[in-house]
C-alpha cells in the first residue's frame, strides 16, 4: 500500500492507497514542533483505526511546503516503516519540461 502525505501551512493530509483505490485519509495540523516519534505514533494510530497495519505500507510519498515538518516526517518513515520516502519537491526529476519564462514562479 502507498502512504501519501501532503504538508500544507495549516493542515497535513495523509492518505493510504491500495493500488488506485483510496482506502482512507486523515487531516491533522501541520505542527512544526512535532517529533518523528509523535508523527510515528499518530500514523500508527490512524492506520490501526482504519483496520490496517504499518507493515502493509510498502511505499511513502511526501510533499511539503513547510520545511521544518519535512525532516521529522522523513525520520518517522525510516524509523517506523523502514521506508525511505520519495520527497516531491524542487529538483525532483519527473520527465516534464517546464517551458515558462521563470519556472520558479510556478
Q: Can you describe what each PLM-predicted range is?
A:
Residues 17-21, 48-52, 90-93:
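Short amphipathic alpha-helical segments, especially helix-boundary/capping motifs
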Residues 42-58:
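Conserved active-site "lid/cap" helical segment
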Residues 1-2, 59:
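Residue-level preference for the first positions of well-ordered beta-strands
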Residues 2-45:
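Short glycine-rich, Thr/Ser-proximal phosphate-binding strand/loop in the N-terminal lobe
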Residues 53-106:
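Short beta-strand-loop/turn "lid" adjacent to the catalytic site in phosphate-handling enzymes
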